[in-house]
């Protein structure tokens, strides 16, 4: 029976992980395509928090002083996964839950647009066990959720999830540091912290501390924050399903001008435009 390329890298047994890790293809493409207003774009999702609570976190509030706070940025829906899918392809494509979903290979994602324009891309996923992993992975010491498929914006698209060369650009978060050191970061990036650091299984305090610890040194790193770099730090959805789905969102990087507050109404599909 032929192996389904959309599920061939989902095994989580230790032996399977080690075997796949030893042979997994990893790619770190670069490019220098000039955009209209920015040349590098980084999107980071934190998890499940209402705007007012996130805005009250001291570390997130600090980051807001370094860029532009978007007062009217809305997540698309509930629960988590459709918001990530929308960030990767400008639509939820009918996905309404957090299960193991697959979107037909004929459906375009942001990757198709980027590659057509010869813009390099990668996604960095904290605690993904190896490049191109298609499943969900738990902490091997304590059994906690670490990397989850539902928080990956691209793997559900079969145009990515069944293509070895595209899977090679869906990488463990540790490879971000390597690519940064080698000056081989791409022009488009999506970064997902693990289930603790994004606040999903912890708190907004943990998420805010992680975000500041990660971003603050990068803002002064010339290899990362080049002249036309735009970073969007946001939450996938609000905590409350009964309120409007407004989420704390900050634009950072040298492509922005600090001390301004934006009044545009935006959502997760906007970032693929």
Each predicted region: which residue ranges?
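Flexible, surface-exposed loop/gating regions in the mature catalytic domains
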Residues: 2-273
